[in-house]
Amino acid sequence: MTDSPVLALAKDLISRQSVTPEDAGCQDVMIERLKALGFEIEVMVFEDTTNFWARRGTEAPLFAFAGHTDVVPAGKLEQWDTHPFEPTIIDGYLHGRGAADMKGSLACMVVAVERFIAENPDHKGSIGFLITSDEEGPFINGTVRVVETLMDRGENIDMCIVGEPSSTEVVGDVVKNGRRGSITGDLTVKGTQGHVAYPHLANNPVHQSLMAIHELATTEWDQGNDYFPPTSFQIPNVSAGTGASNVIPGEFNVQFNLRFSTELSNEVIVQRITETLDKHELDYDLKWTFNGDPFLTDTGALLDAVVAAVDEVNSTKPALLTTGGTSDGRFIARMGGQVVELGPVNATIHKVNECVKVDDLEKLTDMYENTLKHLLAK
């Protein structure tokens, strides 16, 4: 039996070992297909990362698909039922690294656009593709750099679907119409090292910090809103001491992260945490990593089109959620346009035996194509 166009393309992409930041030729495959549709292609290589921007049309609105060709490492091969880079169908599921996150989505995007343009060669507006090989890694030279390049020349995306695996039980049951912001602090509290038997000759930074850390951990940062839960403060890593039981440490290192709603900003978080540490008279260094601002698409033509497109395939409307981690949508949202995430079921992403239901790929392709029809068909 011959594979469908979307299944054949998904298999081709999965077979390429594109572990971050490698692309392994995935983008060349997509570019060849898009060139045949009349897209103008701009390859953007930054350091070790390969990206491309493709556009068909010059008029507004500019609708874009965004995604990534890179995947996380497969881990121990012996734990997989099949080779992670040899796509295999088992009981109606396509197995392979990237099947759900997110080479399946990429295949659906390309085939959906091929079908849409075949029926609508003179469509309204413009269609774009923003593809990177740096989403699973440090996200330094990927989507963010492409977005900066486009913004510098005044080329802003009006509407964007990011193909991240948003679904939970059934493809299309969840659309992410926003994401929380993320900020990480690396705090080093300074003390004076000494012998535990002579505490008066030392200054224990752990003891000095406990009240401040407790205050930060129990602070109510906000109450959230209709779209976001309250801001979360979590401590993932702490370290101090030499490993010896008789040495008071000279430094105490605490790493913390906040996932925050649109009720807060990076600036407010930095100010409040700095004020708390200063109030407790700590001697400290604090380095910040700004991972992304929160974004929200609560209304607009894109959201209406995506909800309708999912309903036409599933006969039920998707839930609109902002849960989960960050995605490249946070960078695209800087352009001021509407951004949503719609992709496969996420139950097996980053796991051994990652897989996606073959029928879900066909349904997702229909959802993407229907969205295009709602937005750009004349």
UniProtKB/Swiss-Prot annotation:
Q: What is an example of a GO molecular function annotated in this UniProt entry? A: cobalt ion binding
How cofactor binds (record note)? Binds 2 Zn(2+) or Co(2+) ions per subunit.
Q: Which domain of life is it from?
A: Bacteria
Query: Which cofactor(s) are needed, names only?
Result: Zn(2+); Co(2+)
Q: List the disulfide bonds.
A: none
Entries under SUPFAM superfamilies matching the protein: Bacterial exopeptidase dimerisation domain (SSF55031), Zn-dependent exopeptidases (SSF53187)
Its EC top class is: hydrolase
- Give the metabolic or biological pathway: Amino-acid biosynthesis; L-lysine biosynthesis via DAP pathway; LL-2,6-diaminopimelate from (S)-tetrahydrodipicolinate (succinylase route): step 3/3
Q: Active site: which residues?
A: 70, 135
* Catalytic activity of the protein: N-succinyl-(2S,6S)-2,6-diaminopimelate + H2O = (2S,6S)-2,6-diaminopimelate + succinate
Name the Enzyme Commission number(s) assigned to this protein.
Answer: 3.5.1.18
Q: Which GO terms describe its biological process?
A: diaminopimelate biosynthetic process; L-arginine biosynthetic process; lysine biosynthetic process via diaminopimelate
The record's listing under InterPro entries reads: ArgE/DapE_CS, Bact_exopeptidase_dim_dom, DapE_proteobac, Peptidase_M20, Peptidase_M20_dimer, Peptidase_M20A
Q: Which UniProt keywords apply?
A: Amino-acid biosynthesis, Cobalt, Diaminopimelate biosynthesis, Hydrolase, Lysine biosynthesis, Metal-binding, Zinc
Q: Where does Zn(2+) 1 bind?
A: 68, 101, 164
Q: Which residues form a coiled coil?
A: none
Give the binding site residues for Zn(2+) 2: 101, 136, 350
Describe, as the record does, how this protein assembles with itself and its partners: Homodimer.
Q: What family is this protein classified in?
A: Belongs to the peptidase M20A family. DapE subfamily.
Give the function comment from the record: Catalyzes the hydrolysis of N-succinyl-L,L-diaminopimelic acid (SDAP), forming succinate and LL-2,6-diaminopimelate (DAP), an intermediate involved in the bacterial biosynthesis of lysine and meso-diaminopimelic acid, an essential component of bacterial cell walls.
Q: What is this protein called?
A: Succinyl-diaminopimelate desuccinylase
What are the leading ranks of the lineage?
Bacteria, Pseudomonadati, Pseudomonadota, Gammaproteobacteria, Vibrionales
Q: Which gene encodes it?
A: dapE
